[in-house]
Amino acid sequence: MSNNHPAKYTDVIVPVLAEYAQGATSILDPFAGTGRIFWLHEYLPGVRIEGLEIEPDWETDPRTTIGDALNPPWGPNTFDAIVTSPTYGNRLADHYKAKDGSRRRSYRHSLGRDLHPNNSGRLQWGKKYRVFHVEAWGAILPLLTPGGVFVLNIADHIRNWKRQFVSRWHFETLCAMGLTPERGRKVVTPGLRDGENRELRIGYEYVMKFRKN
């Protein structure tokens, strides 16, 4: 098992997620990774938190449910908050098998094997990435109660010297699926400093809050 997940929630993101989820009684992270969503208990004591993760080989928090976000094991209207950070479609989705000593990072390299076919960590930003996330949001949003909040942590990246507007696409897609935006914030983050375009890394991520009508 491995807890060397290359894209965990950063320390500065967690309190913003907690702020945006204030008032929730039940929270789901459908892309839970190693389980840092449970850090929200420090800010929101007494809240029920569930995490869903497709890769059992991540050293996940024992409270995490192993399963597929495309087919979540809960019924409609189970949670009054969804708090999550999907993959960003950046170079962490590379499938290369790094040689010893390589400083470049990817989900595959960190896990030490190929990813599950339904793991979006396999997908570079593009049509397949967008199709996957439309399907994923379509499976997850019914779990959210009417009036519930959806908190999204997402970031853009640079590819071939051009900014890829991943965050804008998620924002527009979630709005088109019936969510109403309420708040948003840029959060300065350290980010990764290895690999291609490292000198052009975007130094912040977005946290967005939506409400289900």
Feature locations, PLM:
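Class I S-adenosyl-L-methionine-dependent methyltransferase catalytic core
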Residues: 1-213
